């Protein structure tokens, strides 16, 4: 005879997940320049890219070994930062060098030019130079965004763009109007006449969400939690089955 004892554990854990910028504006994953092989456009190419003769190339086009005006224009626009077509070839602009023309000769050793200032890297705020589908840009740690991680984006400190836990305040993030706490995860007030009870918002008919900030579908007085997304909570279900065997 065999018996089974199953225990279901259900837990709710507040999460403060952050979202780095790892995709370009078209939703494609950014490819780190440092991951692209130097001197190889064969089987070792990375996402079809290789650094050949000192410059970043799309291997399929580079292998044609013919000068293609369309590709040279494309290369200057997509695979370079400061470059232009000169005498039919994509060439770094004056004082610029490197495989993607992002290194500036006019700055000190180990520095480059960003805007009008010399900085250690073209990517600001510890970003990483990368290749996108439309242009060279940077992978950015939260809460930074923009082509070169130059723009503060406090929404990147939360797991969902619909959360309002943080807001921009100059060059740093502070808690949103309805939140407090070290991680801005303590609700201090609700929207749409919701009532704050034991740290949670009790929403009136027609609204739902952490702050009662979401309106139910037209014609529905109440909202099913199954159809809503709860960004501040991580639900974990652990199923533990212990089998007992009797002989």
From Swiss-Prot:
<dbReference type="GO" id="GO:0007219">
    <property type="term" value="P:Notch signaling pathway"/>
</dbReference>
<feature type="signal peptide">
    <location>
        <begin position="1"/>
        <end position="17"/>
    </location>
</feature>
<feature type="topological domain" description="Cytoplasmic">
    <location>
        <begin position="241"/>
        <end position="247"/>
    </location>
</feature>
<dbReference type="InterPro" id="IPR000742">
    <property type="entry name" value="EGF-like_dom"/>
</dbReference>
<feature type="disulfide bond">
    <location>
        <begin position="123"/>
        <end position="138"/>
    </location>
</feature>
<keyword id="KW-0472">Membrane</keyword>
<keyword id="KW-0732">Signal</keyword>
<dbReference type="GO" id="GO:0005112">
    <property type="term" value="F:Notch binding"/>
</dbReference>
<dbReference type="GO" id="GO:0045746">
    <property type="term" value="P:negative regulation of Notch signaling pathway"/>
</dbReference>
<feature type="disulfide bond">
    <location>
        <begin position="203"/>
        <end position="212"/>
    </location>
</feature>
<protein>
    <recommendedName>
        <fullName>EGF-like domain-containing protein C02B10.3</fullName>
    </recommendedName>
</protein>
<feature type="topological domain" description="Extracellular">
    <location>
        <begin position="18"/>
        <end position="220"/>
    </location>
</feature>
<feature type="transmembrane region" description="Helical">
    <location>
        <begin position="221"/>
        <end position="240"/>
    </location>
</feature>
<keyword id="KW-1133">Transmembrane helix</keyword>
<keyword id="KW-1015">Disulfide bond</keyword>
<keyword id="KW-0245">EGF-like domain</keyword>
<feature type="disulfide bond">
    <location>
        <begin position="140"/>
        <end position="149"/>
    </location>
</feature>
<keyword id="KW-0325">Glycoprotein</keyword>
<feature type="domain" description="EGF-like 2">
    <location>
        <begin position="180"/>
        <end position="213"/>
    </location>
</feature>
<feature type="domain" description="EGF-like 1">
    <location>
        <begin position="114"/>
        <end position="150"/>
    </location>
</feature>
<keyword id="KW-0677">Repeat</keyword>
<keyword id="KW-0812">Transmembrane</keyword>
<dbReference type="GO" id="GO:0005886">
    <property type="term" value="C:plasma membrane"/>
</dbReference>
<feature type="glycosylation site" description="N-linked (GlcNAc...) asparagine">
    <location>
        <position position="126"/>
    </location>
</feature>
<feature type="disulfide bond">
    <location>
        <begin position="190"/>
        <end position="201"/>
    </location>
</feature>
């Amino acid at each position: 005879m065999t018996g089974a004892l199953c225990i279901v554990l259900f837990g709710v854990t507040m999460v403060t997940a952050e979202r780095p910028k790892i995709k370009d504006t078209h939703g494609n994953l950014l490819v780190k320049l440092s991951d692209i092989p130097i001197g190889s456009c064969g089987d070792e190419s990375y996402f079809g890219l290789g650094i050949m003769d000192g410059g970043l190339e799309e291997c399929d086009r580079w292998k044609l070994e013919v000068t293609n005006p369309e590709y040279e224009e494309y290369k200057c626009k997509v695979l370079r930062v400061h470059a232009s077509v000169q005498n039919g070839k994509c060439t770094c602009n004056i004082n610029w060098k490197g495989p993607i023309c992002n290194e500036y000769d006019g700055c000190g050793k180990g520095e480059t030019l960003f805007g009008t200032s010399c900085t250690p890297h073209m990517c600001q705020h510890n970003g990483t130079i990368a290749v996108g589908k439309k242009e060279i840009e940077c992978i950015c740690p939260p809460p930074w965004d923009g082509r070169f991680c130059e723009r503060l984006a406090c929404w990147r400190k939360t797991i969902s763009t619909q959360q309002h836990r943080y807001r921009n305040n100059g060059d740093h993030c502070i808690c949103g109007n309805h939140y407090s706490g070290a991680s801005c995860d303590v609700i201090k007030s609700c929207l749409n006449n919701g009532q704050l009870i034991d740290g949670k918002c009790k929403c009136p008919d027609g609204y739902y969400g952490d702050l009662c900030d979401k309106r139910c579908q037209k014609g529905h007085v109440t909202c099913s939690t199954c159809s809503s997304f709860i960004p501040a909570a991580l639900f974990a279900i652990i199923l533990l089955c212990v089998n007992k065997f009797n002989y």
